[in-house]
């Protein structure tokens, strides 16, 4: 990408590039060429793309009135999309034609008309669904294929967390007639050697209604648990007694052997119902048959998911408040020892120490009581109690998704605190407060260069920000080291003294943790966030992590998963905007 010239920078000063805290200019000018301005949504942007880069790209198309790259309110990092507003609709149309899916800093951008009215974005008319897409079909190929039928408001291939196509996508036309033409022309067409399915997009409510209609009038049956000795004649004869049959077939493999299931299609729904009622759980050649309504794969998956969710909720309710998580266990503690330690506090339904494939203790386990009261009593009595030379950590067990959600909230809270501290520090510096300025503490990350750990005398600041000359954090092999007091002097009273040593302890722990975390990831931002999350634990829980690689690995994985979950939520917010 060409560098921004002085002339471009000068032009940018005359633009109404809005403040990050304000909303982008509104408008849904795609609905009519009579509108005097046009607002475009520009998505899939590389994080470093700025308003200046976008101006350099879009200004040759026409007169740009404003540009805004949307950013996180706390971290100020790009959310991956922007709004570009032109002074006339024709310039916006040309920008879509000429720049849509062109690379910006190595990424293909996605441009569409900005739809500020939610009712226009969510309307069903003109929106179509495409499935069975070849993995090589990307957003540009999808757009190019369907744009010949009319103006497209948006198009998108659904992708997984790794950016790979899920095999389906959506195209939203401005006009409903264009959508109908596309369906008529492309449904069943071969695209990259695969026959695609194109149909109007249905909302979940409409799909559920359609499914209920199918259930109420089904004629096709699925039969399983069929004995391998069963013949086609036996199978058809068994079902023919309930009414006229359109077809009956037993599924076979390439060698002609039965797969153990088949299908029967009746002429009338009533006959199919009779067959299900009479033959389900009946025996044929010594095997108990299953006979039920035939379902499509996606419907079966939906049913299985609902069953699993019901089971999961039932299990959650059953163990709510009674299942305890116990960590920092000595390697000598086994299931029996764990149960013995907690037995005095109530009836234990299970006690388990988690182990590796080789049978080695992972240093944590679970104890399940019969009532919440017993579990609460055990937490009160056993948490921080020494067992086999180690202080136990005992708490109510939480699901992974709950822990990840909590850790993600901690990330957001920490980002907000850091932003507020930096803002307050800048304000204090601007006010010229002599001798009292303390640099903001950046917990969970290495301090920025030029900012020392301890309170400064500005003329004595270490330019390496509290780091030794070799640039590596100091090593502490035997726990935290309480160093020299800050340059502002010793603590004046007992309370200040306690706070001072707590700060030094946290600093020492953070330095050691950061070293272990940074050895696991090359992403500096992730290393800082993960270190901060682990450092939020009480010090007595952090110390064991420095000694036990297995305990550290467990906490690192949880914090890393929470960080990734947080990043995905940001990306989803970007897509929904």
Curated annotation (Swiss-Prot):
Composition-biased stretches (Basic and acidic residues): 1-10
Residue(s) carrying Phosphoserine: 249, 332, 405
Domain PABC, residue spans: 489-568
Domain RRM: from-to ranges: 38-116, 126-203, 219-296, 322-399
Cell location: Cytoplasm; Nucleus
GO cellular component, as recorded: cytoplasm; cytoplasmic stress granule; cytosol; intracellular membraneless organelle; nucleus; ribonucleoprotein complex; ribosome
Main location: cytoplasm
GO terms for biological process, alphabetical: mRNA 3'-end processing; mRNA transport; regulation of nuclear-transcribed mRNA poly(A) tail shortening; regulation of translational initiation
Biased composition annotated in UniProt, kind: Polar residues: 11-27
Annotated region described as Required and sufficient for nuclear import, given as residue ranges: 281-317
Entry annotated with the keyword Protein transport: no
Misc. remarks from the entry: Present with 198000 molecules/cell in log phase SD medium.
Protein's recorded name: Polyadenylate-binding protein, cytoplasmic and nuclear
UniProt lineage: Eukaryota, Fungi, Dikarya, Ascomycota, Saccharomycotina
Gene that encodes it: PAB1
